[in-house]
Amino acid sequence: MFAFRNRAVTQTLLVRRYSTKRIPQNLTEKIVQRYAVGLPEGKQVQSGDYVSIRPSHCMTHDNSWPVATKFKGLGAKAVKDNRQVVMTLDHDVQNKSEKNLEKYANIENFAGEQGIDFYPAGRGIGHQVMVEEGYAFPYNLTVASDSHSNMYGGIGCLGTPIVRTDAASVWATGQTWWQIPPVARVELKGQLPAGVFGKDVIIALCGIFNNDEVLNHAIEFVGDGVEHLSVDERLTIANMTTEWGALTGLFPVDETLRQWYEYRLTRLPQPHARVNDGTVAALKDAVQADTDAKYAKNLTIDLSTLSPFLSGPNSVKVYNSLADLSAQDIKINKAYLVSCTNSRLSDIEAAANVIKNNKVAEGVEFYVAAASSFVQKDAEASGAWQTLINAGAKPLPAGCGPCIGLGTGLLEDGEVGISATNRNFKGRMGSKDALAYLASPEVVAASAVLGKIGFPEEVYGSPVPGAKGVSSSISVTEAVEAEADAEAAESDPAPSGGVLDGFPAQITGELVLCDADNINTDGIYPGKYTYQDDVPREKMAEVCMENYDPDFGSKTGAGDIIVSGFNFGTGSSREQAATCILARDMQLVIAGSFGNIFSRNSINNALLTLEIPALINKLRKRYEGQPAELTRRTGWFATWDVPAATVTVTDGKNGPVILKQKVGELGQNLQEIIVKGGLEGWVKAQL
């Protein structure tokens, strides 16, 4: 059982009756409400709340075997609901080594033993399969142990990533937990000009709003521009909300989507378990955000002002107009039409229309892989696939391949590549000494023919369009709502569902400021210890934060509360970044925001976290102009009143109040995970 050291533990269960007053909800909150379990009667979920969820489906891919190993290590024998779990093999499908084939066989055998739906190598990329086969479906909440689960939002399904421990929990118990993120409303206005596509939209959004405006947010796309986007374009945009920093990218269910599903009915064998007359007919009963729903931010972009864009090189936050790059005569070595982002039928046909009656330029390698075997079959039937092959494109099996840096055709030292994929991080698609750009399928195909980054119009011999000035805006309501939350905190002392035995009603400690943004997991727990499994707890405590500040250990003590800047815990998935803080007898970290994987690893290991941007801003203002210190004892104390869902900051332990603010509710289901020492302990208790 988890012990809060140096804390008094409340043994009484505090319970609150929820008000019957309607709380306006956005679409994200409404979907989560459907899939949240164990809520107190009358509880309406809101952004910031920690909730237990029972997702409609959970997908794992090549990482299914590590999840299975963790699942077995928990003592689980049988999957709780084998209709909830889906397994696909898609990442390393070109790898025919004995080791990889053995792993694939183990996954298939496990799926067979458990009666789990399994899709072998060659069937397609897992996210595409999830959409095609209806595991991701409008108004569902579907998770996957992969960062591009956001893609499901393109069909009105709330898709979000989880880590392997979460997946093992879903297998064993049918559920895991989620903190409902702040929700950003992104309004798409107008209609895209000819020659501009969904990929250009998300490249523009990533490039224009590139200061973490939507980091760890849920996104809801709205506006009259949505109806002009095809479903394939919506899937592309939702897919790359991951690179934009968001945890979901949700489009509305509208007539365009309903007609798309009507067509899907004719393509799938009927009766189909998930996409059938009944489920499609039910989409006419629209679920919409309340008109007075709250959003953390409102962003707007006018689609009519966009032109073709590229991301890069080597960053999705750097964007340039095609007009500018085309004029620079940037030679390319490789081009890629692959991945779950842009390898659907419309993408392949668009590329084929550009490349028909032409050849891939000498010295250029053009790789193509369909997002699924279904897509490839349709592309072959339409003639688009053969058009690409006749032009000199090199086919790859349906799967992730070069997008994830696996298999044939990777970028080599000094090469330049242009790709219709979602990530161009340095070294991701091959050599760290290569340059990678992201673009739409049309621009990728044109560049493959031209041998340089260029327009389709250059292939056609038509005039090249110029760049436009993009019209966009952002309004941030965080500061206003923070003040409103503070006022509400004064008047609403008990919004929580209660406190379990063994969980403290209050957590208090002195704030120790680590004043930096983007403190990564290597700064928290040095990489040289990550794969040493025998590091004792005392040593973990000693090296905690040493890469960030070697003096951290001498300046901090048990019971302190770390307070830091934005995107705390970014970087790798190492769980020790959370457990080393616990080893120092610190049970709470407050930050402006957290890296998503760190947040999940924290709760999964019983470390509590709170996002309070207003506190960070107050502390930074307090020390403005003073000599910088990596680690600073502030003399301010924070008290988290768990049943009241408020944090009060005072100058001194019993001094004047500096800040009082509402925070997300930590429901009893989540408290139980903490009391059990983390998610694995909780799962074991359920078996």
Curated annotation (Swiss-Prot):
Catalytic EC class: lyase
Iron listed as a keyword: yes
Reaction equations catalysed: (2R,3S)-homoisocitrate = cis-homoaconitate + H2O
Cellular component GO terms, alphabetical: mitochondrial matrix
Signal peptide: none
Composition bias type Acidic residues, residue spans: 481-490
Cofactor: binding comment: Binds 1 [4Fe-4S] cluster per subunit.
Transit peptide: 1-18
Cofactor(s) listed: [4Fe-4S] cluster
The entry's keywords: Amino-acid biosynthesis, Iron, Iron-sulfur, Lyase, Lysine biosynthesis, Metal-binding, Mitochondrion, Transit peptide
Pathway the protein takes part in: Amino-acid biosynthesis; L-lysine biosynthesis via AAA pathway; L-alpha-aminoadipate from 2-oxoglutarate: step 3/5
Gene3D superfamilies per record: Aconitase, domain 3, Aconitase, domain 4
Entry binding sites for [4Fe-4S] cluster: C340, C400, C403
GO molecular function, one term: metal ion binding
EC number of the protein: 4.2.1.36
GO biological process: lysine biosynthetic process via aminoadipic acid
Keyword presence, Lyase: yes
Residue segments, region Disordered: 481-500
Its biological purpose: Catalyzes the reversible hydration of cis-homoaconitate to (2R,3S)-homoisocitrate, a step in the alpha-aminoadipate pathway for lysine biosynthesis.
Similarity-based family: Belongs to the aconitase/IPM isomerase family.
Protein name: Homoaconitase, mitochondrial
Species of origin: Yarrowia lipolytica (strain CLIB 122 / E 150)
Lineage: Eukaryota, Fungi, Dikarya, Ascomycota, Saccharomycotina
Gene that specifies this protein: LYS4
